[in-house]
From Swiss-Prot:
Compositional bias (Acidic residues): 369-383
Family indicated by similarity: Belongs to the WD repeat WDR55 family.
Annotated InterPro entries: WD40/YVTN_repeat-like_dom_sf (IPR015943), WD40_repeat_dom_sf (IPR036322), WDR55_POC1 (IPR050505)
Gene: jip5
Protein name per UniProt: WD repeat-containing protein jip5
Organism whose genome encodes this protein: Neosartorya fischeri (strain ATCC 1020 / DSM 3700 / CBS 544.65 / FGSC A1164 / JCM 1740 / NRRL 181 / WB 181)
Region (Disordered): 39-65, 352-414
Amino acid sequence: MFDTVCTLPLSADLFSQALHPKEPIVSVGLSTGHVQTFRLPSEESDTDGDGAESTSSSRNGKGHIDTMWRTRRHKGSCRCLGFGVDGEMLYSAGTDGLVKAAKAETGVVENKIAIPPAKDGSVDAPTIVHALSPQTLLLATDSSALHLYDLRIPFSPVSARPQQTHHPHDDYISSLTPLPPSDTSTSGFSKQWVTTGGTTLAVTDLRRGVLVRSEDQEEELVSSVYIGGLRASGTSRGEKVVVGGSSGVLTLWEKGAWDDQDERIYVQREAGGGESLETLAVVPDELGKGKMIAVGLGSGGVKFVRMGMNKVVSEVMHDETEGVIGLGFDVEGRMVSGGGQVVKVWHEAVDSDGMDGDMAGGKRMFGSDSDDSDDGDDSDDSDRESRKAAQPQRKKKKNKGKGGQDIMGFADID
């Protein structure tokens, strides 16, 4: 189904990953507090220095990945990243208690927000940052707080306070998925979103606050994603939120029926409990694969679940020792997976013989990411946190041992 086109090594453990909504750009946040932004090569025909055209340079392994900028953005780890809805701004949040808004193209910081401290006065470390619209930024923290900020208010010590704060869960918020705007929406932006935290799912409204919280699911809910266009039948409208659990099970929730799940899909069965489903992404319809979810596992694999059939139909391996932290599809339909100290870019497999599940997925590249050119306006001192101290509460399971892998990558990588 997918095969790696390149492997991009990082200088430290990946804690967060974000894909630009309009351009082939990926940003990463690291355990050291660094934020780095890369431009991926285009799948479309391009022209070399002699004026000759080369088709799909990223497929033949000769494209360039350009480092647009790199800086030590936070004095602790960079826990979360998110682009604005138009891609102009990149929001990052770190364990230093700050949210920073920077120009996506240059990395220059234009705004800062101090995260409200925990009740004991300590830093309330962030877990999610999400731009809901050009006006609203959502920020979730370890203490289970969900802060809403009005981005139209210029920064000042006073205006840095959130406009609203909710507590939809008793535990920290592990995922946030916006619901599509209603047919009567005049703005075209979402005003409701689903969150998971601890063992519950909740729905929050921009104006009315927390609307509903589910029954206790008796397992930790880790990740979530919305998928529409499914087959409608009976009371089902063909719109669901898919939730990944800590024991290898996907649960399906009918939009509007939030009290309890209505279907279960076993993604990874193991004795004593399955592997945690760390991150989810909808496979773009343009790829012609039907309605499908990509699932990033704590064991380092990525499994593909076909909706309707409700079963795993294919699998690739991101890494054999590190879990998948980031997973998504760029504007050209390439899958981007991140975890450990590597980001991988995948394209649709060429000359597939139908044995997608048997494809080798972990292709390595010589060299390592340079740490010599830290650009930007932030501090670049040598403060480094251990992964154990800075990682969110949930531990990643690891498989022992590592198999041999082929070598493939882009030339002239920065």
